[in-house]
UniProtKB/Swiss-Prot annotation:
<comment type="similarity">
    <text>Belongs to the universal ribosomal protein uS8 family.</text>
</comment>
<keyword id="KW-0694">RNA-binding</keyword>
<dbReference type="GO" id="GO:0003735">
    <property type="term" value="F:structural constituent of ribosome"/>
</dbReference>
<keyword id="KW-0689">Ribosomal protein</keyword>
<keyword id="KW-0687">Ribonucleoprotein</keyword>
<dbReference type="InterPro" id="IPR000630">
    <property type="entry name" value="Ribosomal_uS8"/>
</dbReference>
<dbReference type="GO" id="GO:0019843">
    <property type="term" value="F:rRNA binding"/>
</dbReference>
<dbReference type="InterPro" id="IPR035987">
    <property type="entry name" value="Ribosomal_uS8_sf"/>
</dbReference>
<comment type="function">
    <text>One of the primary rRNA binding proteins, it binds directly to 16S rRNA central domain where it helps coordinate assembly of the platform of the 30S subunit.</text>
</comment>
<comment type="subunit">
    <text>Part of the 30S ribosomal subunit.</text>
</comment>
<keyword id="KW-0699">rRNA-binding</keyword>
<protein>
    <recommendedName>
        <fullName>Small ribosomal subunit protein uS8</fullName>
    </recommendedName>
</protein>
<dbReference type="GO" id="GO:0022627">
    <property type="term" value="C:cytosolic small ribosomal subunit"/>
</dbReference>
<dbReference type="GO" id="GO:0006412">
    <property type="term" value="P:translation"/>
</dbReference>
<dbReference type="Pfam" id="PF00410">
    <property type="entry name" value="Ribosomal_S8"/>
</dbReference>
C-alpha cells in the first residue's frame, strides 16, 4: 500500500526507531524533499550518515541514528510563515526557546527556522524536531 504522506512517514519511522534505540533505520519510499530534510537534520546533528539506495521501486534511505531525537513530526497542513512569526510557531511545537528546530521550506531550499530567521526569509512549515 503506498504511503500518502512521504514526509510524515519519514518522521514517524525516525521517531519509532529512535525510541526503540535502534542504531540505523530504513525508510521507503523516498523523495527529493525527503533528501533535503535529511541533509538539514544531518547538518544540525540529529542524524548521522545516510545513503540513498535506488532499487527501481521508489528507492530507500538507510540512515544511521545518533539517539538525539526526542520527538519529531510533520506539520500538516503546511502553514505559511513570515520571518517575524516564527516565535509563535516555536511556542506551539517546541518544548523550550532554544531547544529543537522547525523545518521550513523556502525559495532557497529546506532549512531550520534559525537559519531562515538569520537570512530574513519566510516559508512553509513542514516539520519539527527536538
Amino acid at each position: 500500500m503506498p504511503a500518502t504522506n512521504i514526509l510524515a512517514n519519514l518522521f514517524v519511522t525516525l521517531y519509532n526507531n529512535e525510541t526503540r534505540r535502534k542504531g540505523e533505520c530504513t525508510i521507503l519510499p523516498t523523495s527529493k524533499l525527503g533528501i533535503e530534510v535529511l541533509k538539514t537534520l544531518q547538518k544540525d546533528g540529529y542524524i548521522g550518515e545516510f545513503e540513498h539506495i535506488d532499487d527501481k521501486r521508489g528507492g530507500k534511505f538507510k540512515i544511521k541514528l545518533l539517539a538525539k531525537i526526542t520527538k519529531c513530526g510533520a506539520i500538516s497542513p503546511r502553514f505559511k510563515v513570515k520571518t517575524d512569526e516564527f516565535n509563535n510557531w516555536e511556542q506551539q511545537y517546541l518544548p523550550a526557546y532554544d531547544r529543537g528546530m522547525l523545518l521550513v521550506t523556502t525559495n532557497q531550499g529546506v532549512m531550520s527556522h534559525h537559519e531562515a530567521t538569520q537570512k530574513g526569509i519566510g516559508g512553509f512549515l513542514i516539520g519539527y524536531v527536538y
